[in-house]
């Protein structure tokens, strides 16, 4: 029922119900997409994140979107790549699962994901794309939510396009 769209762009400009933040466990901002989302949302996001007491790897928490076009930010903590034998695939799939679960529980109809864990956490992009698409596809097959994967570059987008 839902559909997946893959695009290149700035996730902070997504005009849907929610964007997903690839956060660190503190939820207090950082580099990459995490820093960009915190900067674009404004200081209120950090204030709300301080009340959440962090987030374990593979899990997700929701906040308001504040100055973002999206109404909500769903923060998820992706795994750091340590060779693939330390539960990384399951933890990455859990990021997508728990984020979508929160969105569906809230009745959201559109959500945008970044490429979780593929930056400084060094998750191999081809494997991350495969896990993302399989997990998302399984969940939205019979649910009315549209998912956009917002890639950082055309090269990143290719990893998702070739998985289709």
UniProtKB/Swiss-Prot annotation:
Expression triggers: Very low background expression levels, induced by oxidative stress due to hydrogen peroxide.
Residues covered by the Macro domain: 1-164
CDD domains: Macro_OAADPr_deacetylase
InterPro entries in the record: Macro_dom (IPR002589), Macro_dom-like (IPR043472)
Pfam family, one: Macro
Domain of life where this protein originates: Bacteria
Listed Gene3D superfamilies: Leucine Aminopeptidase, subunit E, domain 1
Family: Belongs to the MacroD-type family.
Other facts: The grpE-dnaJ-PG1777-PG1778-PG1779 genes are co-transcribed and may form an operon.
Protein name: Macro domain-containing protein PG1779
Classification of source organism: Bacteria, Pseudomonadati, Bacteroidota, Bacteroidia, Bacteroidales
